[in-house]
Amino acid sequence: MNLEGRKIIVNKSSKELADLLKSPENYKDFMPDGLQKFETREDGFKFGLKGMPEIALKIGEVTESGAVLTSANPSLDFSLTAALQSISDNQTEAQMLFEGKFNPFIKMMVEKPLQNFINSLTDKIEALYK
């Protein structure tokens, strides 16, 4: 299952964004409304939103072209990527991309909430760095 957020322009360089995305604490600022729990770890974070189960993410490779977050739960096979494309010294195009391997029943249950989550993340990032 692949989901995409809309492309946005962020008023930060791709290096500045990559530096932000390396730190688990910074992800709290990107979380949608309804955040009920947020815990950081050395290599990631766990969060809970109202009406959804808690999700633990591990921060993987972070470069000036993107950041890859993967599930910290080995039984869930998915990744969330922030794809970054430098436009100028102080502007970057960003897009959230989700890729997950789920059975058809789970896919049917999670597809809409995940798309809403990706849209909310995109909106928050855009609002923070206009």
Which functions belong to the PLM regions below?
Residues N2-K7, G44, E54, S79, ...:
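Intrinsic-disorder/low-complexity, polar/charged segments enriched in Ser/Thr/Lys/Arg/Asp/Glu/Gln
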Residues A72-D123:
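Beta-strand/loop substructures that line and gate deep hydrophobic ligand-binding cavities in soluble
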Residues L17-L21, Y27, F45, I59, ...:
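Hydrophobic pocket/interface hotspot
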Residues M1-R41:
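Hydrophobic ligand-binding cavity/cleft-lining segments
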